[in-house]
Amino acid sequence: GEKFGKSIDGAITLDSEVTIPYKLFKYFFNSSDEEVMGYIKLFTDINPKDFEELNKATLESPYKREAQMYLAKEITKIVHGENGLNDAIRQTEGLNRGNWEILLDKDYEDLYRNSEKTSELKREKIENGITIQQLAVDYGLCNSLSESKRLINQGGISMNGQKIEDSNKEISIQDLKADKIIILSKGK
């Protein structure tokens, strides 16, 4: 249950009940080139020969992020087990590479539970009719309807990983993931 990181704000917890596999994996994958080998020495039981080979590969081709991948996989496996590691890899593939169709209902539930930015949307609001444009404003993604419409028209708003092309699109119950979650995101 100890916090790990430079500051409490950016820290993760090495507790499988608190930090989901995706967040733990992502945190260690984002380790800097300067820190990663020290973390590997500190947190894993890599043998000296493999450590030297990984260090050499990292120095020669840091852009491949082999050491970060090794660290992220090992720490996630230690904290969450093999199933947790598989969840983290699937969630990373789904969210970071736009491969949303591979995500499972449990992935959406994990991501929602561990998200810092969530809002509650009453089911009756969907049933009564709300457009994506209005939803983006009501839940703080955009400051105004005109900003929302402009972003949608420019391909800058996604719902559940799909770019929204029609600012008048009505949200429906079928848009809910795990029967209760909608993920709105801003940016191309």
Regions found by a protein language model. Give the residues of each.
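Conserved nucleotide- and phosphate/pyrophosphate-binding catalytic cores
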Residues: 2-188
